[in-house]
C-alpha cells in the first residue's frame, strides 16, 4: 500500500483516462472507482464510454472497478447517492489492502469526494421550483452564478440546475448549516501539508488533438451502435425526457429519433457539444488549483506506457515528500 490512500486521475473526455487508470492500477495492485455521473447506469455503455474491455489485462486478469452499472436508466441517481456509494467502495478497497484509484471526468463528483464532504440534503422548495420551471437553462445558470461558489450538484440539465439553485438558496438563507463552509474552515486551519493533500493526476491535451480525438471517437461510437443503444433504451421504457436530461449523446440522438433533428444535424451539434463539454471539464480541473488542490499534469499525447511511467514516478516522489520530477522525465 502506498502512503497516499487515494490516487485521483482526471481529464477531459477522450483523453484516455480509463486505459491509463487501468495501467496504474495494475502496477499498484489497485482498484478503480469511477467518477462519472452517467456510467452508473446499466445499458448506457457506448454513449458513456465505459470501455469495459479495457479493464482486462493482456494476461487475462481484470482490474476490479466500482460505481459502474449500479443503477437503472431513468432512475434518479444523483451526487448524494454516488457519494454514499463512493465511501462504501473506498473503505472496502482499503480494508482489503488494495489501492483505490478515483478515475473520471465529472469534476463535481471528484471534488466532492476529495473534500470529504458530508453533504446535507437541503429540503425541496416547491414554491421556488414553480417559479423557476419555465425559465431557460441559460437563465437558470445565470441565476445560479449570482450565488457564487461551486454548484452542489451537476448542472447538465434544467432539472439539476433547478436543484442546484434550490440548494444554493437554502444555504444562502441558512449559512450556519452549510457543510462546505464548515469544511473550508477546517481545511484552512489544517494548512497544506503533504499528508493532507490528495494526489491528483490530470491528463491534458492540446486543443487540436482533443478536437481530433473527439471527432474520431464519435464516428467510432456511431459505427459501434450508439444510435441503436438509444433506440433500445427508449424501447425498454426509459422516458425520452429523461434521456434528453442525460445530455450529450443521449440528448441529441433522442432528438434525432423523435424527428427533431436530421442525422447530419444531430452529428454536427453533438460533436460541438462534446467539444464544449471537454472545455468545461478542463476549466473545472484548472479551477481546482485555485481552490487549493495541486494537480500534476500529464501530456496526453504520449503513449499509455509513457504516461504510466511518469505517473508512477510522481506517485513515488510524493510518497517521499518531494514535488518535482527528475529531468529524465522532462
What are these regions (language model features)?
Residues 1-330:
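Phosphate/pyrophosphate-binding catalytic cores of soluble transferases and nucleic-acid-acting enzymes
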